[in-house]
């Protein structure tokens, strides 16, 4: 299987930070942490920033990934949260 550029750059296990941008709703952070907890149990401390108008939240959360597949799987699951607008 062909590796992409990101996968080639990472050495596992590694710390990987997701930045999730979504609607400023109270359940956003809980949904993000719940999805990550299901795949990689642990204590997570998300960093939360609000947009200037308060319509959006930016949540940064760091995981310890063991495989590239974990990173990819979480990316797709976080992207599928209905109030999420972008995952970086």
From Swiss-Prot:
Q: What's the family?
A: Belongs to the UPF0250 family.
Pfam families, per the entry:
DUF493
**Per the record, what is one GO cellular component?**
cytosol
This chain belongs to the protein called UPF0250 protein bbp_432
Q: Which InterPro entries match?
A: UPF0250_YbeD-like, YbeD-like_sf
Domain of life, per lineage: Bacteria
